[in-house]
Amino acid sequence: MIKVSVMYPSKPGMRVDHDYYRTKHLPLIKSRMGAPLKYYTIDKGLADGEGKPLGAYVAMCYLRCDSVDEYQSSFGPHAQEIREDISNFTDGTSIHQISEVVVENSAKVETAALQRSPID
């Protein structure tokens, strides 16, 4: 399993519409990627490690797929459309990281995440 992390660094005066990100942008990604996107999570930055607002990142999402190839083949054909939608929720830029998931606490964690917010 791989995890694609998309993180938006905090910047003074940065515009971020978290509602749009949650209700439009990520569902767009899910609808375009289809079954290869097993699930996703969205984080909203609140504070840094010392509790100071806003933290290093103002918004983050994590996409889970079985492999890099599955991610690239399902995301790639829609990359331009997805990138063009970014300006609808932020004027910031993102940092991307693809990682291999080495440990995931348990299936219970995944099940709980899926039950919190359906993505289909």
Language-model features: locations:
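Macromolecular interaction modules
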Residues: M1-D120
